[in-house]
Regions:
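Amphipathic, alpha-helical segments enriched in basic
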Residues: 1, 19, 71, 75, ...
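Unusually extended, aromatic-enriched hydrophobic runs near protein termini
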Residues: 3, 8, 36, 42-43, ...
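Ligand-binding beta-strand-loop-alpha-helix segment within the catalytic cores
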Residues: 95, 142-189
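Short, acidic/small-residue loops that bind anionic groups at enzyme active sites
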Residues: 107, 118-153
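Short, well-structured alpha-helical patches and their helix-loop capping segments
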Residues: 88, 100-101, 128-131, 155-166, ...
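Short, charged/polar low-complexity linear motifs in solvent-exposed/disordered segments
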Residues: 33-35, 136, 166-167
Length: 194
């Protein structure tokens, strides 16, 4: 069973987009999977009820696999990460990440403020032993199998050691989640301009 916490308040099109996307994912997943929407309960309930009544009525069967975790604060896309972490400790993003740290959820998804999510993850989830910096992973679709790109522009000043760490992270991901026995590793650099 997988329990995924979803930041229902994060992103430009929240709460509708994260709730609609999670409903579609839950409808396609086996019945042992569960979604926790994290955010303002009354807003989530209203949006969830509207979607299940109209556009996603065919997914009403998944309602019993959904729970809501109250989080009264929202980290805006314009908030500075450090200010958001200190001033919005009851935000949907921070509470969702803490759900993973405390073992209540297996994963966390947010379309919200990327810098705040990285900072909150560093504070509450920590780094795996041997890593000095996290990397954002993005799956790029291709005509064949998707390509995993790590550190999708998040860090402009990576050391050679950090690039090796990213390659190791990507290799583990490609083996474990993409089923690749011998994943290839490449380097794409933006370089530095004068």
């Amino acid at each position: 069973m997988a329990r995924i916490a979803v930041d229902a308040m994060g992103g430009d099109l929240a709460p509708r987009a994260p709730i609609a996307g999670a409903l579609q994912a839950l409808g396609a997943l086996p019945p042992q999977h569960h979604i926790e929407f994290v955010g303002q309960t009354s807003v989530i309930e209203a949006e969830l009820d509207a979607l299940l009544r109209d556009e996603f009525a065919s997914l009403a069967r998944v309602r019993d696999r959904i729970s809501i975790v109250e989080a009264p604060e929202i980290i805006a896309m314009t908030d500075k990460p450090s200010v958001a972490l200190r001033g919005k400790t009851n935000s949907s993003m921070v509470i969702g990440i803490k759900r993973v740290a405390d073992g209540h959820a297996h994963g966390f998804v947010s379309a919200g403020n990327t810098g705040a999510q990285m900072a909150a993850s560093l504070v509450h989830l920590k780094l795996h032993a041997g890593l000095t910096r996290p990397a954002i992973g993005t799956l790029f679709p291709t005509a064949g199998d998707p390509i995993l790109v790590l550190d999708s522009g998040a860090n402009m000043d990576c050391s050679p050691e950090e690039l090796v760490q990213f390659a190791r992270i990507g290799t583990v991901y490609a083996r474990a989640l993409l089923g690749r026995d011998n994943p290839a590793v490449g380097l794409l650099s933006v370089g530095e301009e004068a």
